[in-house]
């Protein structure tokens, strides 16, 4: 019998991490796309790093950052009352770390491709940077941002290595669908693995279809984000 907990956990983790990625990633993307500052290349490289490093390496970094003996880990435990590692919240952190760089890269491309005349007109009318971002930039790039969000959700949904390192593979607690498929294959439960694979594949197709739909720019031709 198939245990559907890993699927629901994966969907919850992906949804929460995507919202957090939007809150963090849009500002970083806007900063990189429109401002020059010292160490910009270093920040850009740091954003790209999670896209190229092995997941186990990223997971190790997160263990160092959020382990019980680390300052961040101690602060989290003091606030929440329990350690972060080997909890479902750790799976959110893993997914966030995995998905945010993709969202930043996609959002930055959307911001850089925006016709600068709109921004100049808004500034000439006295719009602040805050108002410019919310009232001009986001509405004009909303479809690209939604497409990037869908791709970030899909990336978070399929994370394996980072989640395994920091959240573990605890059935009923931290086992996501990717980990459940691995366990099913390892234990010889082919039917369970096949069912989960088919379900997650359907979910992925739906997400990618949404991403491709929103990638249609209202000011230009359809462009696929993938």
Task: Describe the residue ranges of each PLM region.
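Interhelical loop and adjacent transmembrane-helix boundary motif
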Residues: 1-5, 166-205
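Transmembrane alpha-helices
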Residues: 19, 97, 104-107, 111, ...
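C-terminal transmembrane helix and the adjacent membrane-cytosol boundary/short C-terminal tail
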Residues: 39, 101, 106-127, 194-226
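Membrane-helix interface segments
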Residues: 35-43, 71-72, 87, 117, ...
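Periplasmic/extracellular loop-to-transmembrane helix junction in inner-membrane transport proteins
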Residues: 1-19, 31-39, 78-81, 184-191
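Non-cytoplasmic
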Residues: 67-70, 145-183
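Membrane-interfacial helix termini and adjacent extracytoplasmic/periplasmic loops
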Residues: 59-96, 167-170
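Transmembrane-helix boundary motif in ABC transporter permease subunits
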Residues: 16-47, 60-62, 110-112, 116-118, ...
